Design a protein with these regions (language model features):
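Flavin-dependent oxidoreductase catalytic cores
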Residues: 1-193
Length: 193
């Protein structure tokens, strides 16, 4: 499996999960054979303001190659500037979180709120791809709610903007983490991009 110019040993990718995928957990998953490790999501604004707690989230151990760093935000300029600022860190992929359902993230137009704004998705991804040399990926959801199922549309937009890969959580923002995942929407996205 390849993402941009990065060839993975296997297709087993650790999903980025806030409060879970910290450094010790990632190392454990690497020992168990994960082909790609993903860090906890990091706020682009927190990076901009040099938040002290964010520095801990940026820790990367040499044994956890390859690793994906995930940013969240809604301002293309801030995301691109901060990605450029940290590009020298030893991560191989930069992922944009477009799936977080948590209210404090969504109310700022970040995370899964981006599923409701295709134009902004294009702006964020295209500006980020121009700003850094590392592959850019996105994590999306099935849609924001049952009335807005648009994973295929958002995946196509991300691809058009230059994303190297798209990960799909087969639930809507409204579902959070409960209910059954929609494997068919994941298949549809895979066939579309």
């Amino acid at each position: 499996m390849e993402i941009g110019n990065l060839k993975l040993e296997n297709p087993y990718i650790l999903a980025p999960m806030a409060g879970v995928t910290d450094l010790p957990f990632r190392l454990l998953c690497k020992e168990q054979g994960a082909g790609l490790l993903c860090m906890e999501m990091i706020s682009a604004k927190a990076l901009q303001y040099k938040n002290k707690n964010t520095k801990v989230l940026l820790a990367i151990h040499p044994q956890e190659y390859p690793v994906s760093l995930q940013l969240f935000g809604s301002d293309p300029k801030i995301i691109s500037e901060q990605a450029k600022r940290i590009e020298d860190l030893p991560f191989q992929i930069l992922d944009i979180n477009m799936g977080c359902p948590v209210p404090k993230v969504v109310k700022n137009g970040e995370g899964s709120a981006l599923m409701k704004n295709p134009k902004l998705v294009f702006e964020i991804v295209s500006q980020l791809v121009k700003a850094i040399e590392k592959p850019v990926t996105v994590k999306i959801r099935k849609g924001f709610d049952d009335d807005h199922i648009n994973a295929v549309e958002i995946a196509k937009i991300a691809e058009e903007a230059g994303a190297s890969a798209v990960a799909v959580h087969g639930r809507t923002r409204e579902q959070y983490y409960s209910g059954e995942a929609d494997w068919d929407i994941i298949r549809q996205v895979k066939e579309a991009v």
